């Protein structure tokens, strides 16, 4: 099996390629330098010339807050880029795995979201990932994997942000009224590599066990790091909050168990 993995410089793409290497599965990782996903011609050239058995599409615009000010660019990456890859996968009749987000839901209610619940994104980022889902769903061979609150050794994430702000400021304000499941890309990559070797196409939710608020997550980060940082819990209406998104975007991952 030979796989193409986009977004290899990000935390998930990096770990997926490593997991493939550990299993002696050939995986070619590309980033914007090797294949700009917004360039349809380049996407076609790279995928068609590689003789790949499947494409794992990790590359994405993930800066949620910045997306509100950069709608066109976020759409170009998350929607147009996804379409470019999907078109070639459909033409070659090879599977495509697309990573989406819990932010395709509005976060209302008290229960965790299931795979085929109605989608209603509240922000630009969630909307573009939803539109990407609609594109990928048209492929006969597709995996849509919704993930949440991911963190890993490579790339940027909430843990690294908290550690940086803790050192710079000594105090942070973090929302305590948004609940989710922090998910380690090392664990996620194992599931992804297992899944891509099957023909069990469809939509999946993939997160680690357990739920917490961003505030609880931040407190645990500083505890594990042995840092003395003042963490103030605030709600999402607070002007100095780090996160401003759906209240309860947490997703039910029982299908993948």
Q: Locations of the language-model features?
A:
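NAD(P)-dependent short-chain dehydrogenase/reductase
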Residues: 134-180, 186-187, 194
């Amino acid at each position: 099996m030979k796989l193409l993995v986009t977004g290899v410089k990000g935390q998930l793409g990096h770990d997926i390629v490593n997991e493939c290497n550990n299993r002696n599965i050939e995986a070619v990782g590309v980033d914007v330098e090797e294949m700009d996903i917004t360039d349809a011609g380049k996407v076609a050239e790279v995928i068609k010339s590689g003789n790949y058995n499947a494409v794992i599409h990790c590359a994405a615009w993930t800066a949620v807050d910045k997306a509100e000010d950069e709608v066109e660019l976020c759409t170009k990456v998350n929607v147009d880029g996804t379409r470019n890859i999907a078109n070639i996968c459909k033409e070659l009749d090879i599977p495509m795995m697309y990573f989406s987000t819990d932010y395709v839901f509005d976060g209302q209610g008290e229960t965790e979201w299931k795979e085929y619940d109605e989608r209603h994104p509240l922000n630009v980022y969630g909307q573009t990932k939803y539109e990407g889902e609609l594109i990928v769903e048209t492929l006969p061979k597709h995996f849509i994997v919704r993930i949440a609150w991911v963190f890993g050794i490579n790339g940027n994430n909430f843990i690294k942000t908290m550690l940086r702000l803790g050192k710079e400021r000594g105090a942070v304000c973090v929302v305590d009224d948004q609940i989710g499941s922090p998910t380690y890309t090392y664990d996620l990559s194992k599931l992804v590599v297992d899944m891509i070797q099957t023909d069990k196409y469809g939509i999946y939710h993939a997160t680690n066990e357990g739920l917490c608020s961003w505030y609880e997550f931040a407190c645990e980060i500083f505890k594990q790091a042995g840092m003395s940082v003042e963490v103030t819990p605030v709600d999402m209406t607070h002007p100095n909050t780090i996160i401003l998104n759906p209240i309860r975007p947490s997703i039910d991952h029982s299908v993948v168990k």
